[in-house]
């Protein structure tokens, strides 16, 4: 009898607790389940987005990456550009869109459409990787800045190119940036500065035969 009384007392306590806390507990459970369901939905959505963007980028790579001797045809160039624009339009927050924009810029340069190449490269720099746990892709941004500097120089905008180059910390790209700075100085008829920049490129580890030819050319002008 004592045990039964204890059980009945326990049941009464549970009833009283439920009456006081049950609704709040149900609310908490609903919120947790809804949050988990939303997270699962978001994860599935992200997976689908990445998969679709990846498929488009694979198409870009299949056309843009050659053996180094085969030139990309005119039709394939336009397809690369179209795919890049689709990635930027539909999947702008993905790295696939940023890398595809780099390939699009490459095609524009080959087509001598430098203004369009500039726009593609600026888009990369204006749309860095974002998100709470995301870190910028420094290698991609440094490459985009370097190529943008070259495009600006090719368009006759030496001052703008120099300003861009001087605003960047080149890190492991120091040799390439120093060489570009030398090219800019040559365009500005600043021979002494150009020689110093080319020397800095060599000291940073560049063994480019083309760089040596530039150095020799400056020596002939002295």
Task: Give the role of each language-model region.
Residues 87-97, 127-141, 155, 167-176, ...:
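Short solvent-exposed coil/turn linkers within tandem alpha-helical repeat scaffolds
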């Amino acid at each position: 009898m004592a045990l039964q009384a204890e059980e009945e007392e326990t049941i009464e306590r549970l009833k009283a607790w439920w009456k006081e806390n049950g609704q709040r507990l149900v609310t908490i459970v609903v919120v947790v389940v809804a949050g988990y369901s939303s997270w699962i939905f978001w994860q599935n959505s992200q997976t689908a987005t990445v998969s679709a963007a990846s498929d488009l980028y694979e198409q870009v790579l299949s056309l843009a990456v050659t053996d180094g001797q085969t030139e990309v045809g005119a039709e394939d160039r336009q397809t690369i550009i179209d795919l890049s624009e689709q990635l930027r339009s539909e999947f702008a927050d993905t790295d696939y869109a940023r890398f595809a924009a780099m390939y699009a810029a490459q095609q524009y340069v080959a087509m001598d459409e430098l203004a369009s190449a500039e726009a593609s490269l600026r888009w990369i720099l204006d749309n860095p990787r974002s998100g709470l746990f995301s870190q910028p892709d420094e290698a991609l941004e440094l490459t985009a800045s370097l190529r943008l500097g070259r495009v600006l120089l090719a368009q006759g905008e030496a001052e703008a190119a120099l300003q861009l180059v001087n605003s960047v910390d080149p890190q492991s790209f120091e040799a390439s940036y120093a060489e570009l700075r030398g090219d800019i100085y040559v365009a500005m008829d600043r021979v002494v500065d150009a020689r110093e920049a080319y020397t800095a490129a060599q000291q940073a580890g560049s063994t480019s035969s083309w760089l040596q030819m530039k150095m020799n050319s400056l020596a002939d002008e002295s």
